[in-house]
C-alpha cells in the first residue's frame, strides 16, 4: 500500500508544530538541533517492518503515522543567535521518470505507490524542504538530538497543547467505538474456533480505520 493518502494537504498540526519549534529554538540559541525520523528496519530480505517516526521528529514536524523514513529535521542557528533556520531533508519519491521507479524498492513508486514530494511536504508542514543528499555529511552523522535537547523535548511533550488534547479525546472516543464493535461480534466470537482472533481483527481493523494503529500491542 502507498503512503501518499494525505499528499499535498496541510497538516492540522502544522501551526502547533511551528510553535513547538519556536519554543525549542528559544531554549537553545546558537545551537544546531538535529532530529532524525529514523530509518526502516528490515524484517526479511526486501520486506520492512511498519515504520514509526521518532517521537521528537513527529512532535517538531507535526508528521505522524508513517512519515517519513530517512528524513532529518535540522534547525540551524541564525548568525545573530536569534532563532533558527529550519529545513526538512527528505528522500524524494522515485517517479516513472526516475530509474529508481523500478530499481529502488523503498522509494520507487512501482513498489510502494504514490508518495508525497518535497513541495507536498512543505505544504503539509510549513517547513522548507530539501533532498536528503544535500544534507551536510557532518550533520548526517548525528543519530539523535543531544541529551539536553532530548530532555527539553521530553518535558515539553509532557504538557499537551490544544491539538494533542483533542487528539487524546478523539482516541478515547474511537476506543469506545472499537469496543462496541467487539461486543457486536461476540456471537460470532463464541462460535469461531479462533474467537480471540476475531476480537483482535475487529478492534485492530477499527483502529486502522479511525487512527493509525492500536496504541499498545499488549
Question: What is each of the regions a protein language model found here?
Answer:
Residues 45-51, 147-152, 190-218:
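Short catalytic-site patches enriched in acidic/histidine residues
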Residues 157, 166-167, 185, 200, ...:
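Residue-identity detector for glutamine
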Residues 176-183, 200, 204:
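Active-site environment of non-heme Fe oxygenases that use a 2-His-1-carboxylate facial triad
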Amino acid at each position: 500500500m502507498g503512503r501518499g493518502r494525505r499528499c499535498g494537504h496541510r497538516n492540522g498540526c502544522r501551526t502547533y508544530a511551528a510553535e513547538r519549534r519556536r519554543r525549542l529554538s528559544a531554549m537553545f540559541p546558537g545551537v544546531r538541533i538535529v532530529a532524525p525520523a529514523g530509518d526502516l528496519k528490515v524484517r526479511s530480505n526486501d520486506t520492512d517492518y511498519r515504520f514509526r517516526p521518532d517521537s521528537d521528529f513527529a512532535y517538531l514536524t507535526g508528521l505522524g503515522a508513517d512519515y517519513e523514513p530517512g528524513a532529518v529535521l535540522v534547525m540551524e542557528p541564525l548568525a545573530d543567535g536569534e532563532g533558527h533556520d529550519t529545513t526538512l531533508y527528505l528522500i524524494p519519491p522515485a517517479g516513472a521518470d526516475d530509474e529508481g521507479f523500478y530499481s529502488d524498492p523503498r522509494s520507487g513508486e512501482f513498489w510502494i505507490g504514490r508518495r508525497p514530494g518535497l513541495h507536498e511536504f512543505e505544504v503539509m508542514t510549513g517547513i522548507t524542504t530539501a533532498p536528503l543528499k544535500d544534507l551536510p555529511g557532518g550533520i548526517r552523522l548525528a543519530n539523535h538530538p543531544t541529551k539536553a535537547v532530548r530532555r527539553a523535548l521530553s518535558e515539553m511533550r509532557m504538557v499537551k497543547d490544544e491539538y494533542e488534547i483533542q487528539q487524546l479525546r478523539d482516541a478515547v472516543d474511537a476506543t469506545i467505538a472499537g469496543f462496541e464493535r467487539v461486543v457486536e461480534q461476540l456471537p460470532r466470537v463464541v462460535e469461531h474456533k479462533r474467537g480471540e482472533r476475531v476480537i483482535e481483527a475487529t478492534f485492530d481493523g477499527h483502529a486502522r480505520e479511525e487512527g493509525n494503529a492500536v496504541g499498545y500491542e499488549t
